[in-house]
Amino acid sequence: MKRSCSFSFLFILLLTICIFSPLPLHAEKKGALFDAQTIYVPAYSHIYTGNRERPFLLTVTLSIRNIDPNHQIKITTVDYYETQGKLLRKYLDKPVILNPLESLRYIIPERDKSGGSGANFIVEWESDKLVNPPIVESIMIGARSGQGISFISRGEEIILSK
C-alpha cells in the first residue's frame, strides 16, 4: 500500500510539473503563420582546432526554403556580416520571389575567411498573405587531411528596433 501511494504521488507530481511548466518559445510558434520576418542566421567561415586554435576553413551555404505549398514569398534582404558585425556583402540588388516549395542558396567559398568564426547573415522576407515561414539555415562543411566536418545552424527570428 505504501509503495502504491509513493508511485501515485510521484505520478501526480510529474503530471503537475508537465502541465504547469512553461513551454519554450519555439513550441509556441510552431504552426504559426507570418507575413514577414527578419531572420538572424549564424555562419562559420572557420572554426578552431587543437590547443593552438588553428583555423579549420569551411564552405558556408546559406539555404532559404519556402516551405509553404501554396504561396510565394519575397526575399528582400540577404546580407552577410563578419564577426565584429561589419557588413561584408549585400547579396540582393532587388527582391527575389520564391515560389511554393522553391529553394535558394548562397555560397561562401572555403578560401573566404573574411567572415570569421562569428559570421552571420540577416535575411528578410515578406508575403502579401499569411504563410508558413521559410526554413533559413546555414550549412558548413570542410575537409582536411582525411578529416571532414559538417554542421548546420538554424536561423532565428529577430525583432529590429526602430
Describe the residue ranges of each PLM region.
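Bacterial N-terminal signal peptides that target proteins for export
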Residues: 1-12
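Bacterial N-terminal signal peptides
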Residues: 10-21
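Sec/Tat signal peptide C-region and signal peptidase I cleavage site
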Residues: 23-27
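Short, solvent-exposed loop/turn segments enriched in Ser/Thr/Gly
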Residues: 54-61, 119
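Asparagine-centered strand-capping/turn motif at beta-strand->loop junctions
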Residues: 64-71
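Short, hydrophobic/aromatic beta-strand segments
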Residues: 71-78, 89-91, 133-137
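Intrinsically disordered, low-complexity Pro/Gly/Ser/Thr-rich segments with frequent PxxP/GP/PP motifs
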Residues: 83-120
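Terminal connector regions
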Residues: 112-162
